[in-house]
Amino acid sequence: MNVTQAEIGKEYIIKSIETQDEELDAFLFSLGCYSGEVITVISHLRGGFVVAIKDARYTIDKQLAEAIII
């Protein structure tokens, strides 16, 4: 299951990041988005998602959301 399928407001543990793009991996890691970290979907936007990771909120697009396996 990935972030696009997550329920709003529910906490999930990130199981893995599935991408072949090293820049995308590095970007997600810089947000604190890596295996074992808690992620919460705050809302669905047209073409993206607002997620909470640690104590911060981020807007990510569908491509990023699909790469985050929960």
Describe the predicted segments one by one.
Residues 1, 18-20, 43-48:
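Short, charged beta-turn/beta-strand-edge "cap" motif at the junction between a beta-strand
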Residues 14-16, 30-32, 50-53:
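Short, acidic/hydrophobic/Gly-rich beta-strand patch recurrent on exposed beta strands
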Residues 23-27:
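Short alpha-helix capping/helix-loop boundary micro-motifs
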Residues 42-70:
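C-terminal structural segments of small proteins and small subunits
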